[in-house]
Amino acid sequence: MDLDLQGQVALVTGGGRGIGRNIALELAAAGARVAVAARSRAEIEKTAQEINGPAIECDVSDRVSVEHMVKLVESELGPIDLLVANAGISIDEDVAWEIDPADWWRVFEVNVLGVYLCCRAVIPGMLERGAGRIVNVASGAAYLPGSESTAYSASKAAVHRFSETLANQLEPHGIPVFSISPGLVRTRMTDSNDDLPWTPPELAPRLVRALASGRLDRLVGRYLHAEHDDVDDLAVRADEIVENDLNAIRLRR
């Protein structure tokens, strides 16, 4: 299937740096018109200039801010075909009981409530048109043993479960929802970890581009890992993955 995204409108939150920036650049290179959003306009201006798209200030944990963001994108670019809910934060955490509860909860406000609010804001338009796709960026920290941050890992597990349940609700309407792990990509959030097996930064954008194209729609609701799941292999094995309930977080007995 052609991975050309000509004519599509995409919104990428957290699009000013790291994974979100790379995704925005990939989508724009594939022909999509892309808007990027972040809390600080200065953080996204460079990316917006490179993709010739709008840069929108938005606090994804604030409903009014999110709804305003979506209206701006729709007024400047048109109806949103693809949401990439990428904005996320982490905190330094040695032990959970020494963290300020407000700081701990803020991770959930951005990483979970933010994803929900962004989805909630774009879904009515997608339902009206009977088309659209949603990609929520989660993390392998949701299921890997030894995850060091209770706030971050728990929030990303919530994103996975939210995405799968939302996918079940939207599949009858023809709107696929996916959650992805971009792998361990060197970003400002992870840069303090020097001796880790970094994931090539181009893999997550490549996966999102394939999802945006519709090539992997059979895998609606699945959890896809940018490093461990090859796009071509996913397309070939899609029926097997669904029939055997693979690429899902389950309690196996």
Q: Residue locations for each model-derived region?
A:
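Residue(s) in the substrate-gating loop at a strand-loop-helix junction
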Residues: 139
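C-terminal helical subdomain
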Residues: 179-180, 195-253
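Conserved mid-core segment of classical short-chain dehydrogenase/reductases
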Residues: 67, 90-105, 128, 148-151
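Catalytic Tyr-X3-Lys loop
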Residues: 97-116, 131, 135, 159
